[in-house]
Amino acid sequence: MDLWVVILVGVVALLAGVALGFFIARKYMMSYLKKNPPINEQMLRMMMMQMGMKPSQKKINQMMKAMNNQAK
Protein backbone atom coordinates (compact mmCIF):
# COMPACT_ATOMS: atom_id res chain seq x y z
CA MET A 1 0.00 0.00 0.00
CA ASP A 2 1.05 3.53 -0.53
CA LEU A 3 2.06 5.56 2.48
CA TRP A 4 -0.64 8.19 1.93
CA VAL A 5 -3.38 5.51 2.06
CA VAL A 6 -2.10 4.25 5.40
CA ILE A 7 -1.97 7.79 6.78
CA LEU A 8 -5.46 8.57 5.44
CA VAL A 9 -6.94 5.41 6.98
CA GLY A 10 -5.27 6.22 10.31
CA VAL A 11 -6.60 9.78 10.36
CA VAL A 12 -10.13 8.65 9.40
CA ALA A 13 -10.08 5.96 12.10
CA LEU A 14 -8.89 8.49 14.67
CA LEU A 15 -11.62 10.98 13.76
CA ALA A 16 -14.27 8.25 13.85
CA GLY A 17 -13.08 7.15 17.29
CA VAL A 18 -13.16 10.69 18.65
CA ALA A 19 -16.67 11.29 17.28
CA LEU A 20 -17.97 7.96 18.59
CA GLY A 21 -16.42 8.58 22.01
CA PHE A 22 -17.98 12.03 22.18
CA PHE A 23 -21.48 10.75 21.44
CA ILE A 24 -21.17 7.83 23.87
CA ALA A 25 -19.96 10.16 26.64
CA ARG A 26 -22.75 12.64 25.86
CA LYS A 27 -25.42 9.93 26.03
CA TYR A 28 -23.99 8.63 29.32
CA MET A 29 -23.97 12.10 30.90
CA MET A 30 -27.53 12.82 29.73
CA SER A 31 -28.81 9.59 31.31
CA TYR A 32 -26.77 10.22 34.49
CA LEU A 33 -28.20 13.72 34.91
CA LYS A 34 -31.71 12.41 34.27
CA LYS A 35 -31.29 9.79 37.03
CA ASN A 36 -29.41 12.12 39.43
CA PRO A 37 -30.46 15.73 38.89
CA PRO A 38 -28.38 18.42 40.59
CA ILE A 39 -29.89 19.80 43.81
CA ASN A 40 -31.45 23.23 43.47
CA GLU A 41 -32.90 25.63 46.05
CA GLN A 42 -36.43 24.26 45.74
CA MET A 43 -35.27 20.70 46.41
CA LEU A 44 -33.20 21.89 49.37
CA ARG A 45 -36.20 23.78 50.77
CA MET A 46 -38.37 20.64 50.50
CA MET A 47 -35.71 18.50 52.22
CA MET A 48 -35.48 20.95 55.10
CA MET A 49 -39.26 21.02 55.49
CA GLN A 50 -39.36 17.20 55.53
CA MET A 51 -36.74 17.19 58.30
CA GLY A 52 -38.94 19.53 60.35
CA MET A 53 -36.80 22.62 59.86
CA LYS A 54 -38.16 26.00 58.86
CA PRO A 55 -36.17 26.91 55.75
CA SER A 56 -35.07 30.54 55.76
CA GLN A 57 -33.56 32.01 52.61
CA LYS A 58 -30.33 32.74 54.47
CA LYS A 59 -29.99 29.11 55.57
CA ILE A 60 -30.75 27.85 52.05
CA ASN A 61 -28.16 30.21 50.57
CA GLN A 62 -25.57 29.01 53.10
CA MET A 63 -26.25 25.36 52.30
CA MET A 64 -26.14 25.97 48.53
CA LYS A 65 -22.84 27.82 48.88
CA ALA A 66 -21.40 25.03 51.04
CA MET A 67 -22.49 22.38 48.52
CA ASN A 68 -21.04 24.34 45.60
CA ASN A 69 -17.73 24.81 47.44
CA GLN A 70 -17.61 21.09 48.26
CA ALA A 71 -18.18 20.19 44.61
CA LYS A 72 -15.12 22.19 43.50
From Swiss-Prot:
It is a single-pass membrane protein. It holds the Pfam family UPF0154. The chain crosses the membrane at residues 4-24. It comes from the Bacteria. GO terms for cellular component: plasma membrane. It is found in: Cell membrane. Keywords: Cell membrane, Membrane, Transmembrane, Transmembrane helix. Belongs to the UPF0154 family. This is UPF0154 protein BPUM_1692.
